[in-house]
Amino acid sequence: MLKLLKQISTTSTFKKPSSINNGFININLFKNYCTSVKQEDKKKVLITTPIFYVNGPPHIGHLYSALLGDALGRWNRFIGNDTLFMTGTDEHGSKVDEAAKKNGLKTIDYCDKISNRFRELFDKADIKYDDFIRTTEPRHKEAVTAIWNRLLERGYIYKGVYKGWYCTSDESFLTDDQVTEGMSPITPQNPISKKCMISLESGHEVNWIEEENYMFKLSEFSKTIENWFEEVKPIFPAIHVNLLRYMLSQGIKDLSISRPSSRIPWGIEVPNDPSQTIYVWLDALTNYLTVTGYPNVSPNSSQSHWSNATHIIGKDIIKFHSVYWPSFLIAADYPLPKSIICHAHWTVNREKMSKSRGNVVDPFLAIDNHGLELIRYFLLKGGGLENDGDWSEHELAVRFKSDLADTYGNLISRCTGKALNPSGEWPKSVTDTSLFTMDDQKLIENSSILVKSVSTHYDRGDFKSGIFEIMTFLYECNLYVQNQAPWKLVPKPNRVGSDLIRLNTIIYIAIEMIRITSLLLSPIIPTSSNLTLNYLSIPLENRSNPSNFKFGYNYHQNQNNLKLPKEILILFHKK
């Protein structure tokens, strides 16, 4: 098992490049360092979001999960990986059946309606998924049947009687240590709270049940899973491992992986036993194999994207993805995921989002009211992997004005306007490095450090930290232009001391910073980034591959297009 664990790579750390020495740079070494993202053979990568439960319409938290996956997918395509990014909907279980009845629809018709709503949201939000899986699809039933049979054949499934606590809302069994006396939560369906046993994990009501189920030998994998946590460190951020360590230290019992079909009819039946329905979590988790072509393509095959899988999940489902799922995979003799990126939740003005409070944020309305690019930016910068993000209309306005309009947008309009460039021509490449001042060198050096640091953040799905560093650097770029005062160098009648060479150098460096940061922002705000790169006449072939982070792009390579566009690019119109 440890051999398997060590095969999963860990993220490398950033070291200050040897080309930097006391604020000056060896320009030749620096040019090599600018291709700072490691060039490797193209590899298959699988990126997954949770599949979203269709017992209700999508909310802003669902969109956040999908955006994390989308940004990670875009980044992996940028660096040249053969990327399969999937999302989808989880459509089985009692809660879905109940929701369909409340809406007066057949269960499959209800699933179609809500699943389509998720797809509409992701299309509206420019989520570039490669596969949208539904657990009601025939291909998924085939995959679930296959993994059930494999676990059965390998001796990890047996029939037994389960006695214990069951939470219908969470569709999860709980031990005595995971429940306590409490009050049932108030919901539209149950407006009066009552004394009952509740889950310590979710606060939802639990009931004692005794029934015959198929059981999975989960207890056999406790030590192996613990070793996986310690040896491979697959869960990011590591803070989320603490709860799992505690859970394992308390001991884990065998897991019921079926329900009587008389109680849970809406699901995939156990092979050769129609009296039982497969547990919704074994069903749902298997979707990650379904999208790779399983069972027709083995997860052990080098041709499968499963060989390098990253799951993006919310903290509320970490137990299922980090204990149950790897145990199923080990039992089936399939590789484990490379990493599990676990994110926190969203509050609204520091309050928990809930229907009873009436503060659930509709993502469709949010995009309509604020525009897609701002919503993408706000969620990816404001959301948290460790701590909950907070939805605030005030913060939306602040982020728009401070970051997008005043910092990124201002640098673009400032450096391409006629005030600094009355000739309206692209600046010439600066090949004579003796023309660089210490301030020039420092900014170029910092752009290289930025690329390396942001790449490290992006590789592990920490877009919040990456965006923070980009915006800090863009603020530095604006300060650089302010301090260099290029407007004093623009030739004008009766002006003495104009210096066209120095003016060209300042504008060239500033525009290069715009190009490099636009590439870095392309997974976050793809439309705005592409509009900027279009404006700079950057060909499509120069908008991917880490080599394009290299400082020194020749804007004069197209001799037929030496002029800047006549109209200044204004990406973000202030309201």
From Swiss-Prot:
Binding site for ATP: 355
Catalyses which reaction(s): tRNA(Met) + L-methionine + ATP = L-methionyl-tRNA(Met) + AMP + diphosphate
GO function terms (MF aspect): ATP binding; methionine-tRNA ligase activity
Primary localisation category: mitochondrion
Motif placement: 'KMSKS' region: 352-356
EC number: 6.1.1.10
Cross-referenced NCBIfam families: metG
PANTHER family linked to this entry: METHIONINE--TRNA LIGASE, MITOCHONDRIAL, METHIONYL-TRNA SYNTHETASE
Similarity field: Belongs to the class-I aminoacyl-tRNA synthetase family.
Protein name, per record: Probable methionine--tRNA ligase, mitochondrial
Species, as recorded: Dictyostelium discoideum (Social amoeba)
Gene: mmetS
